Amino acid sequence: MSLISRLRAVVAGDDYLDSDYDDLDYDTDDHMDADHRSDHASGGALATPSDSSPFDLGGGFSGSNVIGMPGVGSTSAEVNLMEPRSFDEMPRAIQALRERKTVILNLTMMEPDQAQRAVDFVAGGTFAIDGHQERVGESIFLFAPSCVTVSNTSYDEASAPSMVSQDHDSVPSSSQQTGAAPVPAWEVTRAGGL
């Protein structure tokens, strides 16, 4: 029996533990061949596949060793609304994204520099899982995994206020001094024309 026909027999689920199994090119004595046939006939040395075997060649796939992805196949989508007070709470947002849950971050309770750091951190995690991100309002951001489609029909990018239009050498305005809302890094690059 050639190697290819033996592979076909294994894949097709044929009983490959028959006398053709010994047709390898080994030098054997005739009395060893007779002993092997008698053991095979009595079922002594060779084990036959049973129904309790984890390697069922002929039956369907049991799926007992398959680990599902979190959130796949669930009937409803989850949205987590988070109002963090410090950057230390950001890993929870990343974990929710990894579990294929949408996260809305309301960063109004954070200091502006910490809020900017938090937005950049969660945006990086969202990018790593091929997710989507959207600025919903002032200091409010939506981060969604790749299984969620985010569309925005009422947002006009040209009419959106931007803090990038200000010169870096000029004196900051009063809105920047009082803790204006953070602008995510991807908004800065879009407005900058890059």
Swiss-Prot record:
One of its GO terms (cellular component) is cytoplasm. GO terms for biological process: division septum assembly; FtsZ-dependent cytokinesis. It is found in: Cytoplasm. Keywords: Cell cycle, Cell division, Cytoplasm, Septation. Residues 35-54, 159-194 are annotated as: Disordered. Pfam families: SepF. The keyword Metal-binding does not apply. The keyword RNA-binding does not apply. Its main location: cytoplasm. It comes from the Bacteria. Cell division protein that is part of the divisome complex and is recruited early to the Z-ring. Probably stimulates Z-ring formation, perhaps through the cross-linking of FtsZ protofilaments. Its function overlaps with FtsA. Belongs to the SepF family. Homodimer. Interacts with FtsZ. This is Cell division protein SepF. The lineage of its organism: Bacteria, Bacillati, Cyanobacteriota, Cyanophyceae, Synechococcales.
